[in-house]
């Protein structure tokens, strides 16, 4: 039976206590020119910052080339990093210099890891894992974390924290998470998940059909799939014209069985970023189901020219799909230093469409706390300052079946400011307990 979409509980937010760069161009030839004789040295702070940004933007891809869609040209990763440094700083660094710098950092990181590992067996496994990795993979913390997790084995603490930057003492950076889900260049394809097996194996029995392709490859449990999520600023110019800016956005996609499964992050690494009491992340995960928990890292786009006037609207929209007809409740908790600041609870009916049930939370207003937070963030003079603030800012979104109280989706959001001119980016992870 077709229901009517709509909100049936209060939309109000409640508190738990009470109410840059140069535009100089240059292709392969420019990148191979000698170093400029700048007094700051080969890897001055501005070059190092751009280098770290480029590492996050372009994941290791071996000997393969990357095609830039806006140019149609093919580049190697080191060439892209050199190109990025040139565009951001106006200073030329060659591909060979980039390669050499990556090797230096890889050796430094390998020494740090060996120094931290006390157990000889774990040290031997770590050395074996690192021997099979390229320098680029070692300093790509996403790949490195996956490899070291295998080397540690169950019950061993993480070698380096999820929140550490690529270099010791580097303020405001967390390049351990890739901004792009570039499946072609996945460093280490994750293993299939329990309950999410690909149909490429033995033919399933009629009573056990294969899981749909979006399970394990997007923000989706066996009961609910997030199709879209966005936070935005909108301003009406006239009755028919709106200016809209997306701060963060997860767009609709159509995963296939050939796509890789999501990478995993140990949930214990982010426990301190979210409330610990009943209804907090740890409590929810212990109750399960385990396939409903995700981490989304957003690189938020704060670069907007829309004037913040009285007619401006700050909102959030999201869309979900389910094979079941139910009433869902969506709780959104804004957290600072791991403590809840405000919460909003919305309840939605299903709408039957094309053989499934859809749920839409459309243009839900942002609370005053969030609007003020965005204002203050935008007025900080440097991106590293913004990232330093955002390191202690998180959002926990929990979607439940209103009648059974079953957790359908639990999404932990963490943030940085986008350093790209291409707008907001994101990367999605499964949360697991290794």
Swiss-Prot record:
Keywords, in A-Z order: Activator, DNA-binding, Nucleus, Transcription, Transcription regulation
Nucleus as a keyword of this entry, yes or no, is yes
Mutating residue 373 to A has which effect?
Answer: Reduced transforming ability
The places in or outside the cell where this protein is found are:
Nucleus
Q: Which Pfam families match?
A: TEA (PF01285), YBD (PF17725)
List the record's Gene Ontology CC terms alphabetically.
chromatin; cytoplasm; nucleoplasm; nucleus; protein-DNA complex; transcription regulator complex
Q: In which tissues is it expressed?
A: Preferentially expressed in skeletal muscle. Lower levels in pancreas, placenta, and heart.
Stretches with biased composition (Polar residues): 1-28
Per the record, the GO terms for biological process are:
cell fate specification; DNA-templated transcription; embryo implantation; embryonic organ development; hippo signaling; muscle organ development; positive regulation of stem cell population maintenance; regulation of transcription by RNA polymerase II
Consequence the record notes for mutating residue 429 to A/H:
Loss of interaction with YAP1 and also activation by YAP1
Residue segments, region Disordered: 1-42, 188-215
The organism's superkingdom is given as Eukaryota
Report the GO molecular function annotations.
DNA-binding transcription activator activity, RNA polymerase II-specific; DNA-binding transcription factor activity; DNA-binding transcription factor activity, RNA polymerase II-specific; RNA polymerase II cis-regulatory region sequence-specific DNA binding
Alphabetized InterPro entries for the sequence: TEA/ATTS_dom (IPR000818), TEA/ATTS_sf (IPR038096), TEC1_TEAD_TF (IPR050937), TEF-3 (IPR027255), TEF_metazoa (IPR016361), YBD (IPR041086)
- DNA-binding region, residue intervals: 36-112
- Which effect does the record note for changing residue 429 to A? Important loss of interaction with YAP1 and complete loss of transforming ability
Pro residues composition bias: residue spans: 201-213
Purpose of the protein: Transcription factor which plays a key role in the Hippo signaling pathway, a pathway involved in organ size control and tumor suppression by restricting proliferation and promoting apoptosis. The core of this pathway is composed of a kinase cascade wherein MST1/MST2, in complex with its regulatory protein SAV1, phosphorylates and activates LATS1/2 in complex with its regulatory protein MOB1, which in turn phosphorylates and inactivates YAP1 oncoprotein and WWTR1/TAZ.
**How does this polypeptide assemble, per the annotation?**
Interacts with YAP1 and WWTR1/TAZ.
**Protein name according to UniProt:** Transcriptional enhancer factor TEF-3
What is the source species? Homo sapiens (Human)
């Amino acid at each position: 039976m077709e229901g009517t979409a709509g909100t049936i509980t209060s939309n109000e937010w409640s508190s738990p206590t009470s109410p840059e760069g140069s535009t100089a161009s240059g292709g392969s030839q420019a990148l191979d020119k000698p170093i400029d004789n700048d007094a700051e040295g080969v890897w001055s702070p501005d070059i190092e910052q751009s280098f770290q940004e480029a590492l996050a933007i372009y994941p290791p891809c071996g000997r393969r080339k990357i095609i830039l869609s806006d140019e149609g040209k093919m580049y190697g990763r080191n060439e892209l990093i050199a190109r990025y440094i040139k565009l951001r700083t106006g200073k030329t660094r060659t591909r060979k210099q980039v390669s050499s710098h990556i090797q230096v950092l890889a050796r430094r990181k390998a020494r740090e890891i060996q120094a931290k590992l006390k157990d000889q067996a774990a040290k031997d496994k770590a050395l074996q894992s690192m021997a099979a990795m390229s320098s680029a993979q070692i300093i790509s913390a996403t790949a490195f974390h996956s490899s070291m997790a295998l080397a540690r084995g169950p019950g061993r603490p993480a070698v380096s924290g999820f929140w550490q930057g690529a270099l010791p003492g580097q303020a405001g950076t967390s390049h351990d998470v890739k901004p792009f889900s570039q499946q072609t260049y996945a460093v280490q394809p994750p293993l299939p998940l329990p309950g999410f097996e690909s149909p490429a194996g033995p033919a399933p029995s009629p009573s056990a059909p294969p899981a749909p392709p979006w399970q394990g490859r997007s923000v989706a449990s066996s009961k609910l799939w997030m199709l879209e999520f966005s936070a935005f600023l909108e301003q009406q110019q006239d009755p028919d014209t709106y200016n809209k800016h997306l701060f963060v956005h997860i767009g609709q996609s159509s995963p296939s069985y050939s796509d890789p499964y999501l990478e995993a992050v140990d949930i214990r690494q982010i426990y301190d970023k979210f409330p610990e009491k009943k209804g907090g992340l740890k409590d929810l995960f212990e109750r399960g189901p385990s396939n409903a928990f995700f981490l989304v890292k957003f690189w938020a786009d704060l670069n907007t020219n829309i004037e913040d006037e009285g007619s401006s609207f700050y909102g959030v929209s999201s869309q979900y799909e389910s094979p079941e007809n139910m009433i869902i409740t969506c709780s959104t908790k804004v957290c600072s230093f791991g403590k809840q600041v405000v919460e909003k609870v919305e309840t939605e009916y299903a709408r039957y469409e094309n053989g499934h049930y859809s749920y839409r939370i459309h243009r839900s207003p942002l609370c005053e706390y969030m609007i003020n937070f965005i204002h203050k963030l935008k007025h900080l003079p440097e991106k590293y300052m913004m990232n330093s603030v955002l390191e202690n800012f998180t959002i926990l979104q929990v979607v439940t079946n209103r009648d059974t109280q079953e957790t359908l989706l639990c999404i932990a959001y963490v943030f940085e400011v986008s350093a790209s001119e291409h707008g907001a980016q994101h990367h999605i992870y499964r949360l697991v307990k290794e």
